[in-house]
């Protein structure tokens, strides 16, 4: 069974936890009735083993097994420093 590994890009909005960051994933959706394109944001908790991310960084993350109650994503790379 070959499942595709989910990867996303987002902006770090909080780095105050130990070995964890909060990443905001922004996507654009069409309003179901009016058709206007709206920005929607999802906040994810991400595992950052080396505490290398700072708020404002653009990062790539991938899904993994659940690491805690709210953490099931891990940091792959820092694409752009803040």
Curated annotation (Swiss-Prot):
Family of this protein: Belongs to the universal ribosomal protein uS17 family.
GO CC terms in record: cytosolic small ribosomal subunit
Species assigned in the record: Aeromonas salmonicida (strain A449)
Organism superkingdom: Bacteria
Gene Ontology BP, a term: translation
Gene that specifies this protein: rpsQ
UniProt KW rRNA-binding keyword: yes
Keyword presence, RNA-binding: yes
Function: One of the primary rRNA binding proteins, it binds specifically to the 5'-end of 16S ribosomal RNA.
Subunit composition and interactions: Part of the 30S ribosomal subunit.
InterPro entries: NA-bd_OB-fold, Ribosomal_uS17, Ribosomal_uS17_bact/chlr, Ribosomal_uS17_CS
Keyword terms of this UniProt record: Ribonucleoprotein, Ribosomal protein, RNA-binding, rRNA-binding
A GO molecular function held by the record: rRNA binding
Classification via Pfam families: Ribosomal_S17
CDD domains in alphabetical order: Ribosomal_uS17
Protein's recorded name: Small ribosomal subunit protein uS17
